[in-house]
């Protein structure tokens, strides 16, 4: 078992500087350069100072409007993709008023900032296990997962969240080194038993991890919402 998380050990400005350095490293990804991938990496974003929740998804696709090579500004998961935000609203993590922005067919820069500011207000940070943006929904390579897991661990250490939520088995396994059946995890939650796990030691600190189903695409959004609701009780 790891030691408890040390809260407020970094000044907020320090976190910004550390994340900027990390993001520069991400943007120099050797995998994207080797493949000639022109899509921009999708970085983490939201509340960066000990957020209540640190949500980890798998990998972004071209559907994220901030992946466009011509985009300048924030690059946060699921920008312009409405179905993910419905899951967070239905689970009680975001106010329903956010639908005025997230249900738009076409987002603009103001919409991106509206969602980013809402994440800060509610204490959420969003990121992906692999930041490389794909042209389809295919899973990332083993090599990319290994490389980006190290980056994710740095990101966690900078942000110092109170709880990590892993959406899907791939980020859960990368974070904890364990494998579980999410259906069993859900059944235990239905009986009132919430299971939490710990990250592989990140320095001297282990962070709590709560797994849930991937919320969009080939995932299980209804089951993901159900587990997230149990978590918020």
Segments (PLM) and residue ranges:
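A polyanion-binding, active-site-adjacent surface
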Residues: 2-188, 193-195, 204-231
């Amino acid at each position: 078992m790891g030691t408890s998380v040390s809260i407020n050990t970094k000044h907020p400005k320090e976190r910004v500087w550390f994340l900027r350095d990390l993001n520069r490293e991400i943007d120099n990804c050797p995998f994207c350069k080797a493949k000639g991938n022109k899509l921009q990496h999708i970085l983490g974003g939201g509340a960066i100072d000990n957020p209540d929740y640190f949500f980890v998804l798998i990998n972004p696709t071209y559907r994220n409007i901030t992946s466009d090579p011509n985009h300048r500004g924030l690059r946060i998961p699921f920008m312009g993709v409405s179905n993910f935000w419905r899951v967070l609203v239905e689970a009680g993590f975001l106010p329903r008023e956010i639908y005025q922005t997230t249900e738009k067919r076409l987002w603009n820069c103001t919409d991106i900032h509206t969602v980013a500011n809402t994440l800060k207000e509610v204490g959420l940070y969003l990121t992906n296990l692999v930041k490389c943006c794909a042209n389809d929904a295919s899973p990332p390579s083993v090599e990319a997962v290994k490389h980006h897991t190290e980056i994710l661990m740095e990101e966690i250490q900078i942000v110092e969240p109170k709880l990590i939520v892993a959406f899907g088995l791939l980020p859960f396994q990368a974070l904890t080194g364990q494998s579980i059946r999410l259906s069993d995890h859900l059944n235990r939650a239905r009986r009132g038993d919430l299971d939490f796990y710990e990250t592989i030691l990140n320095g001297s600190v282990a962070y709590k991890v709560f797994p849930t189903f991937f919320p969009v695409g080939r995932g299980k959004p209804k089951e993901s919402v159900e587990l997230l609701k149990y978590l918020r009780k």
